[in-house]
From Swiss-Prot:
Lineage of origin: Bacteria, Pseudomonadati, Pseudomonadota, Gammaproteobacteria, Pseudomonadales
SUPFAM superfamilies: YggX-like (SSF111148)
Alphabetical list of InterPro entries matching this protein: Fe_traffick_prot_YggX, Fe_traffick_prot_YggX_sf
Disulfide topology: none
Keyword entries, A-Z: Iron
Protein name: Probable Fe(2+)-trafficking protein
Gene Ontology annotations for the cellular component aspect, listed alphabetically: cytosol
rRNA-binding listed as a keyword: no
Length: 90
C-alpha cells in the first residue's frame, strides 16, 4: 500500500516519499509533510535555480540560499525564480 501525506505544498493528501531525502530532523519533516510530487517539482525548480543563477554547491552561501528557497517553496511563500528562463514549447 502506498503511503500518503498531507502535502504542505499542495494542501491535499498525496503519495509520500519512500524515504527521507536528507538525514536528521529536516529530512524527517520533509518525509512527513511533503508529497513525492512536490519533491519532484522542487528538484526541477532547484536545478533551474542552480543552472540559471550559476550556484556552486561547494559554496556554503549558495547552499544556504538554496535551503532557504526550498523552505519558502514548500511553505507557500514567494520563492526565487530563474529570471529570463523560458520553458521549452511542448
Amino acid at each position: 500500500m502506498t503511503r500518503t501525506v498531507m502535502c504542505r505544498k499542495y494542501k491535499e493528501q498525496l503519495e509520500g516519499l519512500e524515504r527521507p531525502p536528507y538525514p536528521g530532523a529536516k529530512g524527517q519533516d520533509i518525509f512527513e509533510h511533503v508529497s513525492a510530487k512536490a519533491w519532484a517539482d522542487w528538484q526541477k525548480h532547484q536545478t533551474l535555480l542552480i543552472n540559471e543563477k550559476r550556484l556552486n554547491m561547494m559554496n556554503a552561501e549558495d547552499r544556504k540560499f538554496l535551503q532557504g528557497e526550498m523552505d519558502k517553496y514548500f511553505s507557500g511563500e514567494e520563492y526565487a525564480q530563474a529570471e529570463g528562463y523560458v520553458p521549452p514549447a511542448e
